[in-house]
């Protein structure tokens, strides 16, 4: 079970948002590359980057910070990026620049043809980020709730050839209220591709609960606010996951 620290980028800084609101940003570091090195030193085996400006603008906006992170740790652990990835040229630039995976969110829902083409052109590199509330998919930085059922969409994307699904329960993200394990398991059971849990990881109870259902196809979880504000010790969490998964 991978605990994957998130580095959320806004205006070149590492921040955390509350429930996806740009005006609710807390700055944790002025140097995202140093932050990346910190997580690597703590035993991270993968990093999750989000270009927040990019997510809202529809194209990547934190290129310098992303490049600095990849220069710092890209040769040592896989790095994945989401936020504003809406065309094949952007994906190509990301992969050529050293990213292992790109995460497609809103564009997957709005433009499934693009997702299909991306999976064909870059097999093994495409992750879909599905954000849902009460089982329904949300788009556009969580601002719009669609009528799409999350399991139905995920199955379709699996057929396209996506590498994995990151499932975020947006009612919980950044609120430190615990992961929605039940909904994540329900999704993982319906798929054969891996699922990464996200949204609301708070403490060791979440790690224990996740490891108990690892066999359903849940391979990791994104760690955000909890590992930044100190309520969850990252290294201890990964050590626990390794022990329980052994």
UniProtKB/Swiss-Prot annotation:
UniProt-listed GO biological process terms: L-histidine biosynthetic process; L-tryptophan biosynthetic process
Protein name per the record: 1-(5-phosphoribosyl)-5-[(5-phosphoribosylamino)methylideneamino] imidazole-4-carboxamide isomerase
Encoding gene (name): hisA
PANTHER family on file: 1-(5-PHOSPHORIBOSYL)-5-[(5-PHOSPHORIBOSYLAMINO)METHYLIDENEAMINO] IMIDAZOLE-4-CARBOXAMIDE ISOMERASE (PTHR43090:SF2)
HAMAP family to which the protein is assigned, alphabetical: HisA
Disulfide bond annotation, renumbered to this chain: none
Pathway(s) where this gene product acts: Amino-acid biosynthesis; L-histidine biosynthesis; L-histidine from 5-phospho-alpha-D-ribose 1-diphosphate: step 4/9
GO molecular function, one term: 1-(5-phosphoribosyl)-5-[(5-phosphoribosylamino)methylideneamino]imidazole-4-carboxamide isomerase activity
Matches recorded under SUPFAM superfamilies: Ribulose-phoshate binding barrel (SSF51366)
GO CC, one annotated term: cytoplasm
EC number(s) on file: 5.3.1.16
InterPro entries tied to this protein: Aldolase_TIM, His_biosynth, HisA_bact_arch, Isoase_HisA-like, Isoase_HisA-like_bact, RibuloseP-bd_barrel
Annotated transmembrane regions: none
Assigned keywords, A-Z: Amino-acid biosynthesis, Cytoplasm, Histidine biosynthesis, Isomerase
Family: Belongs to the HisA/HisF family.
Annotated compartments: Cytoplasm
UniProt cross-references to CDD domains, sorted A to Z: HisA
Pfam families (alphabetical): His_biosynth
Catalytic activity annotation: 1-(5-phospho-beta-D-ribosyl)-5-[(5-phospho-beta-D-ribosylamino)methylideneamino]imidazole-4-carboxamide = 5-[(5-phospho-1-deoxy-D-ribulos-1-ylimino)methylamino]-1-(5-phospho-beta-D-ribosyl)imidazole-4-carboxamide
């Amino acid at each position: 079970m991978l605990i994957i620290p998130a580095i959320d980028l806004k205006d070149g800084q590492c921040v955390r948002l509350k429930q996806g609101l740009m005006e609710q940003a807390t700055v944790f570091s002025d140097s995202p590359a140093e932050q990346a090195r910190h997580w690597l030193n703590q035993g991270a085996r993968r990093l999750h980057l989000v270009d927040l400006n990019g997510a809202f603008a529809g194209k990547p906006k934190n290129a310098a910070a992303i490049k600095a992170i990849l220069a710092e740790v890209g040769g040592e652990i896989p790095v994945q990026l989401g936020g504003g990835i809406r065309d094949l040229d952007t994906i190509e630039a990301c992969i050529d620049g050293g990213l292992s995976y790109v995460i497609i969110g809103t564009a997957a829902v709005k433009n499934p043809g693009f997702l299909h083409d991306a999976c064909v052109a870059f097999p093994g590199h495409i992750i879909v980020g599905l954000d849902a509330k009460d089982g329904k998919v949300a788009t556009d930085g969580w601002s719009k709730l669609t009528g799409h059922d999350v399991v139905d969409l995920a199955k379709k994307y699996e057929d396209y050839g996506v590498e994995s699904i990151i499932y975020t329960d947006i009612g919980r993200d950044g609120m430190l209220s615990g992961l929605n394990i039940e909904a994540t398991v329900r999704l993982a059971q319906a798929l054969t591709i891996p699922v990464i849990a996200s949204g609301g990881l708070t403490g060791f109870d979440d790690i224990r609960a996740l490891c108990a259902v690892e066999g359903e196809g849940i391979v990791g979880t994104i760690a955000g606010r909890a590992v930044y504000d100190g309520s969850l010790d990252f290294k201890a969490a990964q050590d626990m996951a390794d022990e329980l998964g052994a």
